[in-house]
Amino acid sequence: MQTDTAELIRRTIRSVPDWPRPGVVFRDITPLLQDPRTFRVLIDLFVYRYMRQRLDLVAGVDARGFIIGSVLAYELNLGFVPVRKQGKLPYRTVAESYTLEYGNSSVEMHTDSVRTGQRVLLVDDLIATGGTMLAAIKLLQRLGANVVEAAAIIDLPELGGSGKVAATGTPLFTVCSYDSAE
């Protein structure tokens, strides 16, 4: 069942060559979001995985992690907290910086977004180099959360992010993966 589901989801994701720059193949989830059946299948896959786990919150990484994470939080009857790009939150924040291949960036959360000991599922659409996901994990942990698992629709294992997340001891669940030849 999981293999058929993953293949359905994988077939719905659009690959856009040379975007945002030459040599990059962008994995576009908007066709998946536009198709109500496939979107429901994706959400159900996550719901069935997490419905029996003891979770307090779902955290979603800016921006596509908000889409999946908020729907998943609703379906699991949990709260949702955003992990935002720097400068997007209006209240007191705490930030975690990370390195990109072309510079640095930061993610932020409100200082009161999680309480010590809360069990959090972290969600994003894709894991590539792992910078954003690792920064979000560190940020949640600094705020006192227990990151039960990180989850993404897509893994690009050749870029090393999933291995870096695994090295932190945080479990990672992904639905499908792509290599550079695809």
Curated annotation (Swiss-Prot):
Subcellular location: Cytoplasm
Catalytic activity entry: AMP + diphosphate = 5-phospho-alpha-D-ribose 1-diphosphate + adenine
Enzyme class label: transferase
GO molecular function terms attached to this record: adenine binding; adenine phosphoribosyltransferase activity; AMP binding
GO cellular component, one term: cytoplasm
Subunit structure: Homodimer.
Protein name according to UniProt: Adenine phosphoribosyltransferase
